[in-house]
Amino acid sequence: MIPTLDAHRAEIVALCRRFHVRRLEVFGSAARGGDFDPARSDIDLLVTYDAEVPRPSLAEHFTLRDLLAALLGRKVDLVIAGAVRNPFVRADIERWKEPLYAA
């Protein structure tokens, strides 16, 4: 996992609580670390929202994405868990994902 994520862990936790996130996991090059290019790579995050509260609107989802991007200083792809249909992509996410937050 890239150091930027650990450096901003407290702020990430605060955003997760604010937006009723149950789990937030990093995957892709930011999880692997070795092939992450600080000049070009984005950060791929898998989000699971709390099922006990109303699901956030798309506007709220994109607000969370934008706040995470501003915090981390780079583009963030915020993928909703369960929305990935391609079995090969799902398998790759499962292989590399690392937890950032769990409620």
Show the residue positions of the predicted features.
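Catalytic core of pol beta-like nucleotidyltransferases
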Residues: 1-25, 31-38, 50-103
